[in-house]
C-alpha cells in the first residue's frame, strides 16, 4: 500500500510576509487585551504582518472577518490567515449556547468557503476564573495558541501537497 501522508511544515518556521488579520471581540476588555498580546507576539515572532480590528463581542467576529477579507481582496492586499479572539462566559440564560455555537459555526463556514487558515481563540468557559486561566500571557494563553494554529495552516497552505 502506498502512503499519501504529507508532513506539515515545522512549527516555528518563519512565515515572512504573511498578512494576518486578528479580529477581537472586546466584550471582556481585560481578557481581550491578554489574548491579543499573546496572539500578536506569536505572529510577530514568526515574521507575520498583523492587522487588528475590534468588534463588540464574539458573535460579530465572523461577519467582521468576512467584510475585512473582501475589502483586502478588493485592494489586492489579501490576508493569508485570520485569528479570532474573544470570550464567552456562561450565564443564566441560553444566550451562551447561541453565541458560542454560532460564532464557531460562522468561523468554520468562513474558513471552509475561502480555504482560509484560521485560528479560533474565542474562549467558551463556565467562569471568569477559567477565562483568566486560558488568557494570561505566560500561562497557556489561548490567543497565542490560536495564532500558532493559524500559522501552522499558513505553512501547510504555502507548502501545498508537494
Curated annotation (Swiss-Prot):
Keyword Lipid metabolism: no
Gene Ontology molecular function terms on file: 6,7-dimethyl-8-ribityllumazine synthase activity
Xref: Pfam families: DMRL_synthase
UniProt-listed GO biological process terms: riboflavin biosynthetic process
Pathway noted in the entry: Cofactor biosynthesis; riboflavin biosynthesis; riboflavin from 2-hydroxy-3-oxobutyl phosphate and 5-amino-6-(D-ribitylamino)uracil: step 1/2
Binding positions (5-amino-6-(D-ribitylamino)uracil): 27, 58-60, 87-89, 120
Chain residues that bind (2S)-2-hydroxy-3-oxobutyl phosphate: 92-93, 134
EC assignment: 2.5.1.78
Transferase recorded as keyword: yes
Any one of the GO CC terms: riboflavin synthase complex
Main enzyme class: transferase
InterPro entries hit by this protein: LS, LS/RS, LS/RS_sf
Keywords: Riboflavin biosynthesis, Transferase
SUPFAM superfamilies: Lumazine synthase (SSF52121)
Reaction(s) catalysed by this chain's protein: (2S)-2-hydroxy-3-oxobutyl phosphate + 5-amino-6-(D-ribitylamino)uracil = 6,7-dimethyl-8-(1-D-ribityl)lumazine + phosphate + 2 H2O + H(+)
Residue numbers annotated as active site: 95
NCBIfam families: lumazine-synth
Sequence similarity: Belongs to the DMRL synthase family.
Function according to Swiss-Prot or TrEMBL: Catalyzes the formation of 6,7-dimethyl-8-ribityllumazine by condensation of 5-amino-6-(D-ribitylamino)uracil with 3,4-dihydroxy-2-butanone 4-phosphate. This is the penultimate step in the biosynthesis of riboflavin.
Protein name in the entry: 6,7-dimethyl-8-ribityllumazine synthase
Name of the gene: ribH
